[in-house]
Regions:
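Polytopic transmembrane helical bundles with strong interfacial aromatic enrichment
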Residues: 1-124
């Protein structure tokens, strides 16, 4: 499908935001877990900001790139997106009472998310 120049720019911006924010979010989550919770309270705000940008950019990308019938690729991306939303919810719900437990759960969910995003194109 041919894209206009302006649509290509929008796609590049959304992809860049999605990937960069997602890398920070997942990377900081894995680092916090590995460090035994060190920095969890300091990074909570930036993590939630990155989660928001990642999810909103992903929604925008889905709306532009995945119109029409759903197939294995879309199902894989949807599983990854669901895990990402769940990870953000867990981090938000646990950041005051038990941040390390929440970060551990979120790390597992984000691992599934990253794998789904990486393999989606090749599924089916």
């Amino acid at each position: 499908m041919p894209w206009s120049d302006s649509m290509q720019v929008v796609l590049m911006i959304l992809i860049g935001l999605h990937i960069l924010a997602g890398v920070f979010w997942a990377g900081s989550t894995f680092t916090i877990v590995r460090s035994g919770g060190t920095g969890a309270s300091t990074l909570f705000g930036p993590q939630m900001g990155a989660a928001t940008v990642t999810i909103l950019a992903g929604v925008g990308l889905w709306g532009i790139l995945h119109r029409g019938p759903e197939g294995p690729m879309e199902h894989t991306l949807a599983l990854g997106a669901l895990c990402a939303v769940a990870a953000a919810g867990v981090q938000g719900a646990t950041h005051k009472k038990n941040p390390l437990k929440g970060q551990r759960i979120a790390a597992a969910l984000l691992l599934v998310t990253v794998v789904c995003m990486a393999i989606a194109r090749y599924v089916g």
